[in-house]
Amino acid sequence: MGFLLDPPISQKIQKMRSRVRWNAQAMRERAIDQTRLQIADGLATTSAFSFLVMGDSGFGPQPFGHPQQVVADYLATQQADCRFLLHTGDVVYQMGSPDLYAANFIEPYQQWLVTGDRDQLPSYCRLLFNQPFLAVPGNHDYYNLPTLYGFLVAALRPLRQYLNVPVTKNVTLRGSATGDTYARVFLDYLRELSPEQLTAHLQQHYTTATETGQALTYQPGSFTRLPNRYYQFRYGDIDFFGLDSSTFNRPVEIDGAPVLAARELGSDLPANIDWTQLCWLRDRLVASLQNPQVRGRIVYLHHPPYITEVTKLHETACLSARRHLRWVLDAVVQRVGNEAPTPLIDLVLSGHAHCFEYLRTVDTGHGDRELNWLVCGGSGARLRSQHPDTTTVEEADGVDTRVVAKSQLFVGRQGAGAEKRLPYSFLRIDVQAGDRPQFVVRPFVAEYAQETWTRSELPSLML
């Protein structure tokens, strides 16, 4: 949307670092790993478990109804049987405003909050989850809004209502302040603590020893903050990596493959990409692959590296995310050598495209070959359709093009007028026991068609 301002990547990184006191002396003294958390639910060592996935949810009511609330109510039917929820970003539209968290997040997902009284909704910056609600930021969670535009929207709202012109409810006087609202909701927001308060806080909440340092102890119902905008946790001997793709979703002029292959970063790299995060992911994937106690790996991020949705198939942000993630995976293969399995990662989960899609890459000639890609971005925002001309993703190969990924299943907007169908979705993923786990992916659909809502569970995918 043209009136929204996407801050520079360097600004996103700097502001988010300041909010979590990145690499502060108090962190170094205690050997704290600010990218690691441990879910303290007493069940994290069990090998068979289930979790939920949704994304692009916080849109609020639409002219025909409230799909976000419908999906949230359906989601609640699976909550008791699942250990945690992964949110793939765009938590609140259009620009992550604090003014919209009550209506577009807190109220729909009260079942996930310790305080569930509709008359006493908690403040957005004091939320406490009764089950792990693990998010990564999307582009809308970072957007800013020009002050003048916000005032114009507010001033014109009464006139639009009088003239019976649709009113944009997802635009208020404020934007996200470069992700500040998201950080206050989900992250361990440390910037405002005194040195004494910080010391006491770290002693109380960073208590889990891991091979990478002291980790944040995530306690459902007691302390439910994330240590950083990107992070890792281990559950059921599977490593989960949550990424902030909004800081590596823009093209750069250089080839990053040799950068990621090198042992150390150079000092003259372009600032419009998050090299630190990409190197972190590279190193953590290598360590995970070399750890005999880890039996699988799942990555989740906002921007889908592979997608056939009509508005995202050729989007620069998605193409950049693919290119940069590929650099990382190629570097991982180079470091692990002949021991590198195929695929390197068991599942890659994303959002951004307003649909559900399952794709599989072919032999791309890179570290992202033969991977399973699940796009889960149809949980509340306006749905989009599949590109009408293709069900594959192609790349230039010299003067020709070649297929690099094939869509296996697409669930999105269909038809028009009286024949229009709007299937909103979320996923339940059942992780089975075993040295090499299988994943039973169960898509749940709440469809609006012919002025009626229906619920269904699609056939499971065995991955």
Give the residues covered by each predicted segment.
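Core catalytic region of metal-dependent phosphoesterases/phosphodiesterases
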Residues: 66-160
